[in-house]
Amino acid sequence: MQDRIRKIIHVDMDCFFAAVEMRDNPAYREIALAVGGHEKQRGVISTCNYQARKFGVRSAMPTAQALKLCPQLHVVPGRMSVYKSVSQQIQTIFQRYTSLIEPLSLDEAYLDVSESTAYQGSATLIAQAIRRDIWQELNLTASAGVAPIKFLAKVASDLNKPNGLYVVTPDKVQEMVDSLPLEKIPGVGKVALEKLHQAGLYVGADVRRADYRKLLHQFGRLGASLWKKSHGIDEREVVTERERKSVGVEYTFSQNISTFQECWQVIEQKLYPELDARLSRAHPQRGIIKQGIKVKFADFQQTTIEHVHPALELDYFHELLEQVLTRQQGREIRLLGLSVMLKPELQMKQLSMFPSDGWQ
């Protein structure tokens, strides 16, 4: 464990885009609802409510496939300007309790409340207060996880969804990690999970007892990362938007995709709007020096392309996508990401936007 015990909260809004639509239109509250593109335009689902999820509908799923699973699904186009505005209201609530806020998207964020004096420094009470404020002021529900380390806070926020809170105290970290199924750990996808199971690794305790060198040999960086997490170690800090040299968003597909059109729909309808909103928060002047795109294939090989570009433009990502997919070689795609490098205030540094440990 780390010497300094931190208090990290991960807040995740419940089916955010769909929840905003249900809040603003009572007719949507009792039906299976999704926000996404039209099936005739090969659209994809941005998010859906829990009624739709019961039928297997998921984010980034082609709308046509979602309608086959749930014929009564009502699909509405997204109102990104509204979602951005609500996200800003949520950020304002966070700021009452801490300035150490790391947004991951419009609907989720890490908060470090280690030094907060609110509620006598109780992270549990702060998380309860944040969820209460969001409900009372915005009529939306949020789930939260509290833990001394980031990845467990994120795991915990999912355990009592929707509209729930789960707290992992420092003395319970190792116990929770030991019993945690590996598929619950962020970054462990289907293919990796199969390989882990083939190696006899199913829960955190299995990894903790494994030989580190064998893990590194078999699984590379993933093995090293899992070994640390299995010992309750996650040294990543909560990084505020203004501390960043780059801003990025990415999405791991529940089912691999393969075509340019599928990739472009996800970029246009999901990733680009989120990147646009995050850039506005991180750098209101919107000064950038590069745009980049990242693709991870089904075989876990990753490739990136980044080019100098002075302004965020959707059409430029179209060009970058065409270029990066020339490296596809028939492989399916499991992850897609976009990023921009911010223009520093004093000096332009040519740093990679896609560091080896991934975007935070």
Curated annotation (Swiss-Prot):
NCBIfam families: PRK02406.1
Organism from which the protein derives: Vibrio cholerae serotype O1 (strain ATCC 39541 / Classical Ogawa 395 / O395)
GN (gene name): dinB
Binding locations of Mg(2+): D12, D107
Main location: cytoplasm
One CC-aspect GO term: cytosol
Cited Gene3D superfamilies: 3.30.70.270, 3.40.1170.60, 5' to 3' exonuclease, C-terminal subdomain, DNA polymerase, Y-family, little finger domain
Entry note: cofactor: Binds 2 magnesium ions per subunit.
Family to which the UniProt record says this protein belongs: Belongs to the DNA polymerase type-Y family.
GO molecular function: damaged DNA binding; DNA-directed DNA polymerase activity; magnesium ion binding
Chain's role: Poorly processive, error-prone DNA polymerase involved in untargeted mutagenesis. Copies undamaged DNA at stalled replication forks, which arise in vivo from mismatched or misaligned primer ends. These misaligned primers can be extended by PolIV. Exhibits no 3'-5' exonuclease (proofreading) activity. May be involved in translesional synthesis, in conjunction with the beta clamp from PolIII.
Name of the protein: DNA polymerase IV
HAMAP family, per the entry: DNApol_IV
Keywords noted in UniProt: Cytoplasm, DNA damage, DNA repair, DNA replication, DNA-binding, DNA-directed DNA polymerase, Magnesium, Metal-binding, Mutator protein, Nucleotidyltransferase, Transferase
SUPFAM superfamilies found in the cross-reference section: DNA/RNA polymerases, Lesion bypass DNA polymerase (Y-family), little finger domain
Residue ranges of every copy of the UmuC domain listed in the record: 8-189
Subcellular location: Cytoplasm
GO BP: DNA-templated DNA replication; error-prone translesion synthesis; SOS response
Pfam hit, one: IMS
Reaction(s) catalysed by this chain's protein: DNA(n) + a 2'-deoxyribonucleoside 5'-triphosphate = DNA(n+1) + diphosphate
Active site location: E108
Subunit structure comment from the entry: Monomer.
Superkingdom classification of source: Bacteria
Record site feature (Substrate discrimination), residues: F17
EC numbers for this chain: 2.7.7.7
Cofactor: Mg(2+)
